[in-house]
Every structure is written in C-alpha cells, then in structure tokens.
Curated annotation (Swiss-Prot):
Protein name stated in the entry: GMP synthase [glutamine-hydrolyzing]
Keyword entries, A-Z: ATP-binding, Glutamine amidotransferase, GMP biosynthesis, Ligase, Nucleotide-binding, Purine biosynthesis
High-level lineage: Bacteria, Pseudomonadati, Thermodesulfobacteriota, Desulfovibrionia, Desulfovibrionales
Annotated CDD domains: GATase1_GMP_Synthase, GMP_synthase_C
Species of provenance: Solidesulfovibrio magneticus (strain ATCC 700980 / DSM 13731 / RS-1)
Gene field: guaA
Pfam family membership, one: GATase
NCBIfam families the record matches: guaA_Cterm, guaA_Nterm, PRK00074.1
Length: 516
C-alpha cells in the first residue's frame, strides 16, 4: 500500500504544535512533528509534500533563539509559517524586517483581509474576521516577492503570501478554535495550495500496520503488558490479528485497579479472542511494599519497580519471546524530541520503559504514530466494545495516587466504592462521553458529620472531572449541580467511611489532573 501524503511540522516550542498536527490529521492528511533543529537536507530526505513552521515563545533577535536552517525555504515545498514561523520567514529572506512590538497582541484580534489569496479563498465577505494572536515581535517589512495579505489594529502585516513559491505566513494561529474560519484556512493550504490528497484514515493505518507487524515479527513471539486501558488493549487486539498465538499477554493485577476493571477486560479478551492471556494476582505483593509509604513519588517508584519485577518473572516463563509490545502514543514520542528539551520532571511516569533493556527484548510500538482520539478510532475499526473504547484514562500507579497518604486495603475499598458511584452517575447522566476524565480522590483527613442522631468522624472524598483534548492542558468540567448533588448524596449514604464530598475546580495548569 502506498504511503499517504505527509506534512512536516517543525516545532519551535509552541504550546499549539500538537494542535497543528491534530488539525492536519483531522483533515485526512498524515502529519509528523520534528524539532526545528533538523536541516534542509534532512527535511528533503523525509519527502514531505508540505512544511508548516510552528509558533514559539522566542524572539528571532535573541542570541539563544531556536536554531533553524533557512535553506528549508529553498526546497520548493509549499510552506505555511505560523506566528514565530512568520517572523522567521521575514528575518531570513531578503527585504524582510522584524522588530519588537510596543503593542503586544494576546487573545482575540480583528483581521482585515487586504489581498486576494488562495489561503483565504471561501472566507465570508465581511469587514473583520476574529483570529487568535499570541506574539510580541512583529514583521515590519515583507520579504521580496511577498504581498501583505491581512492586517489587524496593532499589526500592519498579519499575513504574507507568495503564490509563485507557494509560501504563506500568518501572524495568528489558525489551528486554535478561537480563530474563525481557521479550519477553512488550513484546508486551503493543504488542498488548494499544496495539492495534497486526503488519504490518512484509521482503516488505512490499520491495514498497513497489521501487514508491517506480521512481516516484522515473522516466526518470533511477542509479549504484551496489559493494563486494562484502551491503549494496551488495542495493541493486544492488533497483534492478535497480525500474529495470532505468537502473542502472549500478561495482565498484572496490582490490587490498585478500579472496581471490576481487571476481570472485565480479561473476560472480554478471553471471550472474543483466543489469546494466550496470563493473569497474575500480585495485589498482596504490591500492598505489602506500599505499607507505610505516603510520599507520592515513592509510591510511583515502588509500583513501577515491583511491576517490572513481577513482569520479568512471568515473561521468563516464555523463552521464545523476542519482542515487547507497548502502547506508546505520539505525544510521548514528541515529548522526547521536542525542541524544548527535557522538561522539568513534574511526576515520574509509570510505564514499562525499563523492560526492553532489562529483558533484552526488541520493542514494538504499533500506536506510536497516533494521538489518543485516533487510537479510539482504531478501536472502533477493530470492532471493540464501547466500555473499552471510551474508558477514561487511568494512571499506571492506579488508585495508589488517588489515595492521598498511605494505601491500605480498607482505604482502597472506600475509594473503589466512591469512584464507582462517580463513574455510574457520569454514565447515567450522559456526561461520561462528554468529559475527558472523571474520578474520585480519597483525602488524608477526616471531618465531623451527623448521621441520624449520631456524630460521625469520617473521610473526605473529592470529585475530579476535567475537559481536555490530550491531557497536556485541562479545565474542570462544569457539571450541572443536580448531578453533583446526586453523586454526593449517594456517596455519603452508600459508602461507609465517607461523610463529606468536595468538588475540585482547578485547571491544568497550574494544577495537574491527578492529585499525586
């Protein structure tokens, strides 16, 4: 099968870079993000049909501005330069000029179209278009051969066009939802200017990937760590379709799962696929190692280390295994190559990252090109049930990081019952599919309450529900107060050990989605 047309996005550290990639893919065109440090020769070798330069927080005049090879402009490829990318264009090409702006623009701005350009074809004929700005510097003079295509109140040059070279630039962000007609502008660039074909679908991805997996594995065998989440389950089903009984799945029940979670996924896989499924009950081992531990980082490290130890023992029983399959997604890959470099570690990530080296296994990552929403589309293509496809993300350390303080069997049981009510009410009210994630947290404090004629002194539970696209940023969900009232009433009446419920109204940033 032929490879789909590819758009290369060069990342200069913008918070919106992944959003650009998502918007391009939503239009049916495959996109890849690469650091801005790639050379023109490397770009050409990747054979993209078009290039997009992202925005970024730097100034082109800074001594430590992101490195960039201006020869990229001479490759003859259609290019769209966004925000910092536009300033870069004016900085490097003859005739262009960039200066620091005294009037910084952040947020909504009114765009006036000045030139008839294919980039703005089909936009409504009106005086102003709302666009989203986020910049300090601005272009003072257009490079030779470029026409000024738009302006705003504070910026005389808000868009540039060179039709013969098929290079266009925007000072605003067409990828964000706040920009009116941003989708149309990107569509014009991809299909009218670059002439790309809309061939990136999850069915085409699946067809190509299954053939690739079959060829790569050959007669060898693969071990896959199942977590119960959608990513690892999709990986398992894909591999089973590609290599059948040469796949071995290991499900380690660490005792930190949601109510019925392990049994539910294991039952589905056993019922619908003739899988080699090894179910390991290691709950007591994990709880023993977590006894007395209250520090969240320590909890994560203990759980990660113990998982590797248990997985190693089980995988050693499978001597023919040569590959380890993981549910790595594209945002994980991007983070490792981003121009921003190693970010400050906010929390250690629990995954099986240490296993390939420890066990000397080659790695298979069938989903490493996909975003989370695309993984769900693959799951639909595979005919998987809704309860797996739409399951909310769940952290590797499980309920251990939703119990603030020490993890005990008693506290786990309280949290499981509380969380089950939150989940069931989200489903019953029709909100489960509307939000990114919803769950309960058990706090390390008790408060006084009254039940019947008696005084109580019980635990406090928090409800956390957020909206997000990719978990990189999130806002708290505006659940109707009626739903919160039902949740709270049920929790206090049905869960022994909780007498107070609070609702978390923090966004990410500054808070994180999980409490630990």
């Amino acid at each position: 099968m032929s490879q789909p047309d590819k758009v290369l996005i060069l990342d200069f550290g913008s918070q919106y870079t992944q959003l650009i990639a998502r918007r391009v893919r939503e239009a049916g065109v495959y996109s890849e993000i690469h650091p801005c440090t790639v050379t023109a020769k490397e770009v050409a070798a990747m054979a993209p049909k078009a290039v997009i330069l992202s925005g970024g927080p730097s100034s082109v005049a800074d001594a430590d501005a992101p490195p960039f090879d201006p020869a990229v402009f001479d490759l003859g490829l259609p290019m769209l330069c966004i925000c910092y990318g536009m300033q870069l264009l004016a900085h490097h090409l003859p005739g262009g000029q960039v200066a620091a702006s005294t009037d910084r623009e952040y947020g909504r701005a009114d765009l006036q179209l000045l030139a008839d350009t294919p980039l703005f074809a089909g936009l409504p004929q009106k005086d102003g278009h709302i666009v989203w700005m986020s910049h300090g510097d601005k272009v003072m003079a257009a490079p030779d051969g470029f026409v000024v295509a738009a302006r705003t109140k504070n910026v005389d040059i808000a868009a540039l066009a060179n039709a013969s070279r098929r290079i266009y630039a925007l000072q605003f962000h067409p990828e964000v939802a706040h920009t009116e007609d941003g989708e149309r502008i990107l569509h014009n660039f991809l299909f009218e200017i670059a002439g790309l074909t809309s061939g990136w679908t999850m069915s085409s991805f699946l067809e190509t990937e299954l053939a690739s997996l079959k060829e790569k594995v050959g007669d060898d065998e693969v071990v896959c760590a199942l977590s119960g989440g959608v990513d690892s389950t999709v990986v398992a089903v894909m591999l089973h379709k590609a290599i059948g009984k040469k796949l071995h799945c290991i499900f380690v029940d660490n005792g930190l799962l949601r109510m019925g979670e392990g049994e539910e996924v294991a039952a589905y896989l056993r019922e619908h696929f003739d899988l080699n499924l090894h179910y390991v009950d290691a709950a007591k081992l994990f709880l023993d190692k977590l006894a007395g531990v209250t520090d969240p980082e320590e909890k994560r490290k203990i759980i990660g280390k113990t998982f590797i130890e248990v997985f190693e023992v089980e995988a050693a029983k499978l001597p023919k295994v040569k590959y380890l399959a993981q549910g790595t997604l594209y945002p994980d890959v991007i983070e490792s190559v981003s121009f921003k470099g190693p970010s400050a570690v906010i929390k250690s990530h629990h995954n099986v990252g240490g296993l390939p080296e420890v066990m000397k296994l080659a790695l298979i990552e069938p989903l490493r090109e996909l975003f989370k929403d695309e993984v769900r589309k693959v799951a639909v293509e595979l005919g998987m049930p809704d309860f797996i496809i739409w399951r909310h993300p769940f952290p590797g350390p499980g309920l251990a990081i939703r119990i603030i303080g020490e993890v005990t069997e008693e506290r786990l049981e309280i949290l499981r019952r509380t969380d089950k009510i939150v989940q069931s009410e989200l489903v019953a009210s029709g909100w489960y599919r509307k939000v990114w994630q919803g769950f309960a947290v058990l706090l390390p404090l008790k408060t006084v309450g009254v039940m019947g004629d008696g005084r109580t002194y019980e635990n406090v539970a928090a409800i956390r529900v957020v909206d997000s696209l990719d978990a990189m940023t999130a806002d708290w969900s505006r659940l109707p107060s009626e739903i919160l009232a039902v949740m709270s009433n049920r929790i206090i009446n049905e869960v022994k050990g909780v007498n107070r419920v609070v609702f978390d109204v923090s966004s990410k940033p500054p808070a994180t989605i999980e409490w630990e």
